[in-house]
């Protein structure tokens, strides 16, 4: 397994799917969608901060860009796995595009004062910590993403999207509730992953001894 592939597996917690690279062209639809998602990030930020971040129409545009980027994340993975479009380039860039999109949205919302900084720091620290842990244990085998981790990713994206929209009143309260659920899932799945990693490492050491 190459270095870039190990990085992708560590970040995504998905096992390597078939023979990556070599046979698939870099300029395929899956990689184009991944690059498009990365290009969307600065465009999303421009819309988010337009008019000091308080222009309602621009915030709706920012939400549309964010939602589209999240959808492309779903489809590029399906194309890569099911249609022989997996490449080392895509395996390396895809998780970078994911983290860049989510990180930029969280930081942008906090800079505008729409989202408390502690929420952004908590979520990004969890993502960075779990990624580092995955990289540390990758040689011992991949710890697959749990259903909770997948649910966390979905709820997190929905919560961020709701905060991007110019909501008020009961709708804003609903956004806060969804974000609270995302925070709870972020903490629970982070603790669960650390526990599983330590348990697996402990089991390997006992077997070796």
Curated annotation (Swiss-Prot):
Coiled coil: none annotated. Keywords: Cell membrane, Lipid biosynthesis, Lipid metabolism, Membrane, Phospholipid biosynthesis, Phospholipid metabolism, Transferase, Transmembrane, Transmembrane helix. The keyword Zinc does not apply. One of its GO terms (biological process) is phospholipid biosynthetic process. Its EC number is 2.7.8.5. GO terms for cellular component: peptidoglycan-based cell wall; plasma membrane. Its main location: membrane. The chain crosses the membrane at residues 32-52, 105-125, 147-167, 171-191. NCBIfam families: pgsA. This is Probable phosphatidylglycerophosphate synthase. It comes from Mycobacterium tuberculosis (strain ATCC 25618 / H37Rv).
């Amino acid at each position: 397994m190459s270095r870039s592939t190990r990085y992708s597996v560590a970040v995504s917690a998905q096992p390597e799917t078939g023979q990556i690279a070599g046979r698939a062209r870099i300029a395929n639809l899956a990689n184009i969608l991944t690059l498009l998602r990365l290009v969307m990030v600065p465009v999303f930020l421009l819309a988010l901060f337009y008019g000091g971040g308080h222009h309602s129409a621009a915030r709706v545009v920012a939400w549309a860009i964010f939602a589209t980027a999240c959808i492309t994340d779903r489809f590029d993975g399906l194309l890569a796995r099911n249609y022989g479009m997996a490449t080392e380039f895509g395996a390396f860039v895809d998780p970078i595009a994911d983290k860049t999109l989510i990180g930029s949205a969280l930081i942008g919302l906090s800079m505008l004062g729409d989202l408390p900084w502690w929420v952004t720091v908590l979520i990004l620290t969890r993502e960075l910590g779990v990624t580092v842990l995955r990289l540390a244990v990758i040689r011992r085998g991949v710890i697959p993403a749990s259903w909770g981790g997948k649910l966390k990713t979905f709820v997190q994206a929905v919560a961020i999207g709701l905060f991007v929209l110019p909501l008020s009143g009961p709708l804003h309260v609903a956004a806060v509730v969804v974000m609270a659920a995302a925070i709870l899932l972020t903490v629970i799945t982070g603790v669960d992953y650390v526990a599983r990693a330590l348990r697996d490492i402990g089991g390997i050491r006992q077997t070796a001894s």
